[in-house]
Amino acid sequence: MSAPSLPPAWQLYLKDHRISTFKNWPFLEGCACTPERMAAAGFIHCPTENEPDLAQCFFCFKELEGWEPDDDPIEEHKKHSSGCAFLSVKKQFEELTLSEFLKLDKERAKNKIAKETNNKQKEFEETAKKVRCAIEQLAASE
């Protein structure tokens, strides 16, 4: 009988899983922001066509790009998202009690909902602006 697998969101609590996301990461040996150090700081690599070095904290969902070889991932994370609870965890995730883990994951879920809500609000505002412009153009043409 095989061991049960973790839900995808929980797999990101495992550093090795986060490291595995850093395919084609531009900074390897001799750099401060290696995949191992990025993953230790909570980041996953989620590149886009225009942002090949885009990394996102799996916990607070803060996205950072424009990395330089000497950037320290932990310091950058603290500077741009000082309230991220991931940064204050002092134990390995495998050492957390179930209660500690669930309390922590509740914070991650809240962060995810806040990020998704913010994205939807921006999307709505952009659509509303386009519709408003279209209505104004219709009114002006009459």
UniProtKB/Swiss-Prot annotation:
BIR repeats: 18-88
Any GO molecular function: protein homodimerization activity
Keyword RNA-binding set for record: no
Modification note: Ubiquitinated by the Cul9-RING ubiquitin-protein ligase complex, leading to its degradation. Ubiquitination is required for centrosomal targeting. Deubiquitinated by USP35 or USP38; leading to stabilization.
Principal place of residence: cytoplasm
Gene that encodes the chain: BIRC5
Entry comment, domain topic: The BIR repeat is necessary and sufficient for LAMTOR5 binding.
GO biological process, one term: apoptotic process
Residue positions binding Zn(2+): 57, 60, 77, 84
Protein name: Baculoviral IAP repeat-containing protein 5
